[in-house]
Amino acid sequence: MTAEASVETLEAALLARAKRLAEEYLSRAQHSRDRIIEEANERLRLREEREILAAKAMAERVYRRQVQASELKLQGKLDRLRWEWVQAVVQNLSHQCKVLATDKSRYLPVLQRLLAAGAAAIEREELIAEINQQDLGRLQETWKTFAAEAVSDKCVVLSSEPLTCSGGVRVVSKDGRIRVDNTFEGRLERLAEELHQSIMERLFVPPSGLHG
């Protein structure tokens, strides 16, 4: 082989090797490009998923806040309505007590029962009964008989000082240290919470969409 042929053979070999290297580098570059694009697409997909999830979570929070605000608003309206109804019923009951006090035949037996209950609650033998001006006029002359029918085992003296109330009686121990307020107003005040609860249970059913 001549020197010229050897050079050509070497050049051909070098060129072939260069082509193989170029193809290898090109293939690697193509793989790298594909991998970069794939990773970029994956990052983009994950980012989009996170953004979608974040948007959904935000929408859910906004929705829950709107629902809670609506429920609170409705609850407030119901509470006001309930309070108005409770007040109306309590006022009506107070009015009925005042009407009862004007009907002597119905009222005096009730007054005797209130007197008996008040006297029974005080462990004293000598008691004082305080009633309003109207009842003083009715009972001052017949008090001993009236009181004895209600409380047979104790001495209940009628106070000459009228009590400010619509009806009923306040029973006081002789030394003034113990008092049982069985006036209509006193009993209504003590029973207010029980009355409110009873009225709420009778007039209202909790709405199924609300909790708490």
Curated annotation (Swiss-Prot):
Keyword hit for Transport: yes
Gene Ontology CC annotations of this record: proton-transporting two-sector ATPase complex, catalytic domain
Any single GO BP term: proton motive force-driven plasma membrane ATP synthesis
GO MF terms held by the record: ATP binding; proton-transporting ATP synthase activity, rotational mechanism; proton-transporting ATPase activity, rotational mechanism
Disulphides: none
Domain of life the protein comes from: Bacteria
Keywords: ATP synthesis, Hydrogen ion transport, Ion transport, Transport
Role noted for this protein: Produces ATP from ADP in the presence of a proton gradient across the membrane.
Family affiliation: Belongs to the V-ATPase E subunit family.
HAMAP family: ATP_synth_E_arch
Protein name: V-type ATP synthase subunit E
Organism: Nitrosococcus oceani (strain ATCC 19707 / BCRC 17464 / JCM 30415 / NCIMB 11848 / C-107)
